[in-house]
Each structure stands twice: as structure tokens, then as C-alpha cells.
Amino acid sequence: EVGDWSSDVCSSDLNNVLENFSRMAEVLEVKIDDFVFTHQTHTTNIRRAGLKDRGNGITAALDYSDIDGLITDTPGVVLSAFFADCIPLYFADPVHKAVGLAHSGWKGTLDKIGAVLIAKMGEEFGTRPEDLIAGIEPRICQDCYEVSEEVAKKFKEVFITDKENAGFKALNPADILRPGRKGHRG
């Protein structure tokens, strides 16, 4: 066990927040100023982060808004976001030494933020979907999260083609594989 990083992380006491991120930075062997945060508003907007962005959202004010995904090929830039019941999507392109992180809530999932981020990595770095390593964090399950009929209908229209494909759990893995990935592990 390396420490409690979540105590007071969402409190209004900035000193507690900075202390918790300093602890995490120490364990990761980076500086707190290396973190770059999203400005999550449930969009599919992706931003390329570089050295000038380090500290944004933690030790410096964000100079951008409405960003739910970050990509970089710059060593020393630590992509970061906040998650509760939304789904973290991680991407690594070992060929072009680039990474991506997306915050995928129900709106981002519906709008296929995973595919949008993969396309952006292709535009910026030459990433090919078949070269990507993708990871999905654990997420809230359908037993613990109920959606309205209106939201369920939107998902059915976009994702469900037959009874076998039904289920919120399968949407993000399928979304990631659609842009051309040959397979996955796990």
C-alpha cells in the first residue's frame, strides 16, 4: 500500500488536493507539474497535449474547455482525468510512442469517443488502429446504474442490432474494436 490519495481529493481545500497528487506523482516518479487534466463536459472533443500544457488543471489554470480526451507523444506529459461512474479508456501506440486517455460517459459512449480519439491519434501521429493497445477501467454495472427510457432508446438506435448484442457492458469494448483493431486481450 502506497498511501491514501483520495482523502479530501474533492474537498475545497486546495492544499489537500495538491498533497494527494504530490503523493501520487512521487509513486509514479513524475512531478506534479507533469499532469495535464481534461475539462470534462461529456463531449467527444480531443486535445493534443504537449510540454506547454503540463500542470493544466492541477498547478495551473486550464487554458481550454470542453475536452474529454487527451493525446500526446511527448515524454513527460501525464494525461489525467476524473472518473466516477463514467468509463476511462486508455490507448497506447507503441509504434509511434503515443498515448491517449478518454472520459467516456453515456454521451461519449453514444457518440463513440473511443473511435474519435483513435482517429485523432491517426491524424496527429500516424497511429493505425491495429497497432493500438487499449485498456478499459472497471465501470459502474447495469445493476447499479439505471438510465431513462429516452437514453436507453438512443443506445438501441446506435448500438443494438440483435438481442445477443444487448447490454451496456459490451458497448465500449465493441466501440474500441470498430475502427479496425484486429483483436484484444482480456
Regions found by a protein language model. Give the residues of each.
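Short, exposed "boundary/linker" segments that immediately precede the start
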Residues: E1-D4
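Active-site microenvironment for binding and transforming phosphate-containing groups
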Residues: S6-G186
